[in-house]
């Protein structure tokens, strides 16, 4: 869990920004949104399959883009 100790010179806004940045890095908000509703394993697998396909297509695109420069 992220925690921020505010310094004497720091305003509340600065400390809040630091806390938000730490929470984003730890994916706390994203995980809470994902766990808000029950998701069956079939839906999880479907999402994983879609994400894997996107990742593969992106790599293929970057590889072809790089090869065209050679």
Curated annotation (Swiss-Prot):
Transmembrane keyword on record: no
Single GO MF annotation: structural constituent of ribosome
Keywords, ordered alphabetically: Ribonucleoprotein, Ribosomal protein
Disulfide bridge map: none
Pfam families given in the database record: Ribosomal_S21 (PF01165)
Entry GO CC: ribonucleoprotein complex; ribosome
UniProt cross-references to NCBIfam families, sorted A to Z: S21p
Family membership: Belongs to the bacterial ribosomal protein bS21 family.
Protein name from the UniProt record: Small ribosomal subunit protein bS21
